[in-house]
Amino acid sequence: MDNYVTGTAIRTLRVSVPELLSGEQVINVNRAANLRRSRLYVCPVCGNVLHAAGSAMISCCGVTLPPLEAEQPDEAHDVRIEDIEHELYISSAHPMNKSHYLSFAACCTDDRFELVRFYPEGNAEARFFRRGHGILYWYCNRHGLFFKRF
């Protein structure tokens, strides 16, 4: 495709280059930026964790990343949430070895998004200041994203 034509099409259609080439337009329906509607992305190549307040076309290491779909946890991936003096303390008995571990936990309310990164051979524990009701997300490097409302 000619650069002039590409540039003209991008300006006229108001889309990004990846949107133009893929034929899929990304429309952010979360104009109010309610952070409970956040999208999380994880790069399968380098492990980067990316957060967007709404729909976005995200790429890392040359790969276009799909938004993660959060699931209800099974028994092996459940976390314990304790409410201790204005804080949520979360912990998990999930394996934390180099090949299978929890990568992060994120606490999301209407106006705040806080992420704590975990590392292999470390502890899967985090503290978040409690700011009302929200959603807790956590990510297993093998089985994906899980959530629990609080």
What residue spans do the PLM features occupy?
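Short, flexible, mixed-charge glycine/proline-rich loop motifs
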Residues: 30-37, 49-53, 130-131
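Residues immediately within or flanking Cys/His clusters that coordinate Zn2+
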Residues: 40, 57, 137
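Cysteine-rich micro-motifs
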Residues: 54-65
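Cys/His-rich microdomains that often coordinate metals
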Residues: 49-50, 64-65, 144
